[in-house]
Design a protein with these regions (language model features):
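DUTPase catalytic domain/fold
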Residues: 1-186
Length: 186
């Protein structure tokens, strides 16, 4: 079951979910944009963009081991600012992270939550994808959310820190999950 904005607030208050810093305001106040939609919350782009070095002399072999071992020594990380955004050219893939840290704790006596990261429709209409095939944020996750940013449009897209880049949709998890660490968690 997808959580409403009211249930997202309740989960934050009860400790079944943590977002740091917490998106504010919780309700529309007429001054600031409210990051809580009826069934999602907006998250912002952090200040680092990472990408494979250009002109690498190899093909990616998915059987060679964990992605993080391949990506680390073959990538560049660029800090972006309001004065120096990252310009995402058409047909280019980069990795970004959310400004916010998200925690979906595994709970024994309460219903755990999982989430899906989705793009913002206004950005999608410009050709920007924020996840390619990896929308799932599993129960037990803690950290910033990695975004696979792809420009499928015909024009360059400037990426600024703190732009509302994606939205999280939360769902209840039936039963108590057993922790299963991955290359990105654990």
């Amino acid at each position: 079951m997808i959580l409403s904005n009211v249930e997202i607030h309740r989960a934050l208050d009860e400790g079944r979910l943590a977002i740091n810093p917490e998106p504010l305001p919780r309700l529309p106040d007429g001054i600031f944009d409210c990051p809580y939609q009826t069934s999602a919350v907006d998250l912002r782009l952090g200040n680092e963009i990472s990408y494979f070095k250009e002109g690498l002399p190899f093909d990616i072999n998915l059987r060679q081991g964990p992605f993080v071992r391949l990506f680390g020594p073959n990538s560049v990380t660029q800090v972006i600012t309001e004065e120096q955004p990252f310009v995402l050219r058409p047909n280019r893939l980069v990795l970004g992270k959310t400004r916010e840290r998200v925690s979906l704790p595994l709970l024994a006596n309460s219903q755990s939550l999982a989430a899906r990261v989705e793009g913002k429709s206004s950005y999608a209409r410009c050709g920007l994808l924020v996840h390619f095939t990896a929308p799932t944020i599993h129960a037990g996750f803690e950290g910033t959310i990695t975004l696979e940013l792809i420009n499928l449009g015909p024009c360059n897209i400037s990426l600024y820190p703190d732009a509302p880049i994606c939205q999280l949709i939360f769902e209840s998890v039936a039963g108590t999950p057993v922790r299963n660490d991955s290359q990105f968690q654990g």
